[in-house]
Amino acid sequence: MDNQELIEELLEIYDIVKQVGDYIIALQINSDDDFDYTIYRNGEELDGGIIENPDGLEEITPEIFTEIMKMHDIKEEN
């Protein structure tokens, strides 16, 4: 499965899916209003986790992606 097919499949489950180089970050707000994410690299699931949402944000902001990228040392390609 190529990255585009994986992204399309993940969009059926997750709220937002973003590709950064070889990585795909899939992110959603779970039933506890926290941010649930999974990271894929080259089509394979690599890691994932939950980021608490103490401010009760109702939408996913770019800062959440930035935090995930920093935690997993993923860098934007220029």
Protein language model regions, located:
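Short acidic DE-rich linear segments
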Residues: 2-4, 73-78
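Serine/threonine-rich, low-complexity intrinsically disordered segments
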Residues: 9, 40-41, 76
